[in-house]
């Protein structure tokens, strides 16, 4: 069985994913999505990301830490010196179907060429969501970024509806959030979209009719100049 390599991340319109050693937002629903999606699979991360977890492996997953200088061994934990070595480790774990790359920025940049699919949570300010201005200048400050990519290589398999970003999954409906987010599932064109998984995501999160990929800024600028 071939190991599927997936990138999973939350990012802002400027492709920002982090500020220092923390996320620029707090989204319990997205964290729940992360836990459910990666549970039972292999997760790969850089050393700095691992340290933000207190150097403890994420439960219910096999953890691989990328590091050329440090070695990690433990229950559901090992280390690798390269992306290729990490993939090879995951490949020999017959009970694991996917390897999820979970950060940070440098690891995403190294891993994207090996990726078959991406699970991206797109975070936008409330003002942009209200006006449907997915490419507005309103963004979050970040010093760590997700790598750029384009629709020449990637297919949009699923886009969820907007969700309110609140501190609690049970927050009252009248609370006005400062930002919203959507779940996106993308697949490399050479791999294609899984119809069964797209139906599963649609059932869980709903869908939209938005067809314009949010990263295709060049298309948007050409459109505005017509």
Task: Specify the residue positions occupied by each region the protein language model found.
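Enzymes that bind and transform nitrogen-containing heteroaromatic metabolites
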Residues: 2-226
């Amino acid at each position: 069985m071939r190991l599927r390599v997936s990138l999973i991340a939350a990012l802002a319109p400027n492709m920002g994913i982090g500020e220092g050693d923390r996320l620029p937002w707090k989204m319990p629903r997205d964290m729940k999505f992360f836990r459910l999606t990666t549970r039972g699979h292999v997760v790969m991360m850089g050393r700095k990301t691992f340290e933000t977890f207190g150097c403890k492996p994420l439960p219910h997953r096999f953890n691989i830490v990328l590091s050329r200088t440090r070695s990690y061994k433990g229950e559901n934990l090992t280390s690798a010196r390269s992306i290729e070595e990490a993939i090879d480790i995951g490949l020999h774990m017959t009970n694991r179907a996917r390897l999820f790359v979970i950060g940070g920025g440098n690891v995403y940049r190294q891993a994207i060429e090996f990726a078959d699919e991406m699970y991206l949570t797109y975070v936008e300010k409330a003002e942009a969501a209200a006006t449907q201005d997915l490419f507005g200048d309103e963004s979050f400050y970040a010093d760590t970024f997700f790598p750029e990519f384009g629709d020449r290589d990637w297919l949009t398999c699923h886009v969820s509806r907007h969700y309110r970003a609140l501190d609690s999954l049970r927050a009252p409906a009248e609370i006005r959030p400062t930002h919203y987010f959507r779940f996106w599932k993308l697949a490399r064109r050479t791999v294609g979209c899984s119809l069964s998984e797209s139906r599963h995501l649609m059932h869980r999160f709903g869908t939209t009719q938005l067809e314009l990929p949010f990263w295709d800024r060049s298309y948007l600028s050409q459109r505005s100049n017509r």
